[in-house]
């Protein structure tokens, strides 16, 4: 049989599409028509401009479809054809299924294009009407009779008038079960049909179809618990296997085949037995592509991930949609993700939704964690899946995960505030584990080329982590002024402080300099508030004394926390942190203005006691030897540390902070997730039609 190849350019004039959207009913068993309609090749839109071009070519066809389908039920016939072909795929051999896969993909692509159009221009009610509409014999007969009786030049106007009057008297005939059956078929396609080279795009299209259906949230202003689409998807009986399949697609990051369905560039299909066998995926990874993107930055990596690994990218986005919506009710997808287990383990406690190779998930996340959607998935797994959290804490190469997160924070001006926030929360969650806080100081790194503030030939992972968090605090003070960002930064440092070890001299300097910077700001702000109202000059006219008082209060909380972090290190790890003691001796004057301040005096007493102890020892040695060099001072500190007892210090509670999700987290996560879908996904939606979610978050 010959194959008719339709290109994007001639979609609008395609006779098969014109018949499909026309006024005549086409039965689902009209094989000649469906073979003609579904034998086409199309270049998928790669960006929003491609999608805009495709949409403009389909506009007239879509309008005809909207006007006629509720009478013809042709959309329902197409859905039935898709359901039949999906069912048949399960029983066909590879060689037999090549043409079937191609036609199934084409059917699904047409369905998705129409669903997208209805979502963007209509309502969910209209979408479901078109899904369920069956041929209306009365309306079709009225149209046919009118067409036969009316001269050609006025046939169209008369036909529309007849249809409108008939439609007023005759309700739309609907099936009632087709939409739910369609959702089940999509899930079956994703989880049952194996991913091979010639099925890759079919799986991708099925995932994109689910995302497109759920995008009804973007274009409607009703809550998702009232949405039939959401209720149908979220009551799916196969949540575990769907979540398992999607996470496997992410973990395996299989590169997109060079050709769709194994076709040649000429558009014909040539499949021999050997070629069919060779088309089966071995799920090998292509790390060089992503590593090159990782080196270039998060934006470049996002582009490479979407272009070269679209199935993994879209599966990741769909996971985020499914797990962040409907959190107030029982969400089977969310429960499934949070209760999965390592396939190399035999969990004895707790329910297990499915098993997956955690090492593959971990390795993939390490590779792509600098992109927003990967950071979000990592957050969900660490925060809510205890098994995965324990697995990560046991890894010997934690730098593979932590360093990319630190790079995201280091490149804060190029990252969006949401990504910075989530990256910090991930660090905070990691810092809740004492083993992590100890291990980061035993992992040594050399030549950190991306850290350009200062050349550091060797530093511990813990040391560079402290430097980046301090830098983030200072960046936030200047640019973002986000109290919650400060809180998360300081909480992570506080959790780690009792385990600081072998701090690099520069790290010790930055810790004390952080207090010094904050102290200067406090002094300046306090002085401004104490000036007479008539002589006070405010640089920012929008800043009131009340605002400044609030800023001062926040600043005092931050200063207090920094002092407690220093105190925690001195109390627990003084003998292992001579460089910090050295810096405190050198910078002792920065604490002078706060010794009598009620908010700081108790903790500063401890710091003063340490400084006094080592200062007196240095003075005695200097009296004997004269002026001491840096190494000699450190030698005195090390000897003194062996005789120091922390019992002299006032006891404070251990600094232990745990991340707690705020109330109504969906208010943060749902807009964020859909912003990522719109910006980094393979499905491009009309931004002009979006109502319920703003997509102007800078990603």
Swiss-Prot record:
Keywords, sorted A to Z: Lipoprotein, Myristate, Phosphoprotein
GO process annotations (BP): Golgi organization
Pfam families: Dymeclin (PF09742)
One cellular component term from this protein's GO annotations in UniProt: Golgi apparatus
InterPro entries named in the record: Dymeclin (IPR019142)
Modified residues (Phosphoserine): 346
Lipidation (N-myristoyl glycine): 2
Domain of life assignment: Eukaryota
Family: Belongs to the dymeclin family.
Name of the protein this chain belongs to: Dymeclin
Organism per entry: Drosophila melanogaster
């Amino acid at each position: 049989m010959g194959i008719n190849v339709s290109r994007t350019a001639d979609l609008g004039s395609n006779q098969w599409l014109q018949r499909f959207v026309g006024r005549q009913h086409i039965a689902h068993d009209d094989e000649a028509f469906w073979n003609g309609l579904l034998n086409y090749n199309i270049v998928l839109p790669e960006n929003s401009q491609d999608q805009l071009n495709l949409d403009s070519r389909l506009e007239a066809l879509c309008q005809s479809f909207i006007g006629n389908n509720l009478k013809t039920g042709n959309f329902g016939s197409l859905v039935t054809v898709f359901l039949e072909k999906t069912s048949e795929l399960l029983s066909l051999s590879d060689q037999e299924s090549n043409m079937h896969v191609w036609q199934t993909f084409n059917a699904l692509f047409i369905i998705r294009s129409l669903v997208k159009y209805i979502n963007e221009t209509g309502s969910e009610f209209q979408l479901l009407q078109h899904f369920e509409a069956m041929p209306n014999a009365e309306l079709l007969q009225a149209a046919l009779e009118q067409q036969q009786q009316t001269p050609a030049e006025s046939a169209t106007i008369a036909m529309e008038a007849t249809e409108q009057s008939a439609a007023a008297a005759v309700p739309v005939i609907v099936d009632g079960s087709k939409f739910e059956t369609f959702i089940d078929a999509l899930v079956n396609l994703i989880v049952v049909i194996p991913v091979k080279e010639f099925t890759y795009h079919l799986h991708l299209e099925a995932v994109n179809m689910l995302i497109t259906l759920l995008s009804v949230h973007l274009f409607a202003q009703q809550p998702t618990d009232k949405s039939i689409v959401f209720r149908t998807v979220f009551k799916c009986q196969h949540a575990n296997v769907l979540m398992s399949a999607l996470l496997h697609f992410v973990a395996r990051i299989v590169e997109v085949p060079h050709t769709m369905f194994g076709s040649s560039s000429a558009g014909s299909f040539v499949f021999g037995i050997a070629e069919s066998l060779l088309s089966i995926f071995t799920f090998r990874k292509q790390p060089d592509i992503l590593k090159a993107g990782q080196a270039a930055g998060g934006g470049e990596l996002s582009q490479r991930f979407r272009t070269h690994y679209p199935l993994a990218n879209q599966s990741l986005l769909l996971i985020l949609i499914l797990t962040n919506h409907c959190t107030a009710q029982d969400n089977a997808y969310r429960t499934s993700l949070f209760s999965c287990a390592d396939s190399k383990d035999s969990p004895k406690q707790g329910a297990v939704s499915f098993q997956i190779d955690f090492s593959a998930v971990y390795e993939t996340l390490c590779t792509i964690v600098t992109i927003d959607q990967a950071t979000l998935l990592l957050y969900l797994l660490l925060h809510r899946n205890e098994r995965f959290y324990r697995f990560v804490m046991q890894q010997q190469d934690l730098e593979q995960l932590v360093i990319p997160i630190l790079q995201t924070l280091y490149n804060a001006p190029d990252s969006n505030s949401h990504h910075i926030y989530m990256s910090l929360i991930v660090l905070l969650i990691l810092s809740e584990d004492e083993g992590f806080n100890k291990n980061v100081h035993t992992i040594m790194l050399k030549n950190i080329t991306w850290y350009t503030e200062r050349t550091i030939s060797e530093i511990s992972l813990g040391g560079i982590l402290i430097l980046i968090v301090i830098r983030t605090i200072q960046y936030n003070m200047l640019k973002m002024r986000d109290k919650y960002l400060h809180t998360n930064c300081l909480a992570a440092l506080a959790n780690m402080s009792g385990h600081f070890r072998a701090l690099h001299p520069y790290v010790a300097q930055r810790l004390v300099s952080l207090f010094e910077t904050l102290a200067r700001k406090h002094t300046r702000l306090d002085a401004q508030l104490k000036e007479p109202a008539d002589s006070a000059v405010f640089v920012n006219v929008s800043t009131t004394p009340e605002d400044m008082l609030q800023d001062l209060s926040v600043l005092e909380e931050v200063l207090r926390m920094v002092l407690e972090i220093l105190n925690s290190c001195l109390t627990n790890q003084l003998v292992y942190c001579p460089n910090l003691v050295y810096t405190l001796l050198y910078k002792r004057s920065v604490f002078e203005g706060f010794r009598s301040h009620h908010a700081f005096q108790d903790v500063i007493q401890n710091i003063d006691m340490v400084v006094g102890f080592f200062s007196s020892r240095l003075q005695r040695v200097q009296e004997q030897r004269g002026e001491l060099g840096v190494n000699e001072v450190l030698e005195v500190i090390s000897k003194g540390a062996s005789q120091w007892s922390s019992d002299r210090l006032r006891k404070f509670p251990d600094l232990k902070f745990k991340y707690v999700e705020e109330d109504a987290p969906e208010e943060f996560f749902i807009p964020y997730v859909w912003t990522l879908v719109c910006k980094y996904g393979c499905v491009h939606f009309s931004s002009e039609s979006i109502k319920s979610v703003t997509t102007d978050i800078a990603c």
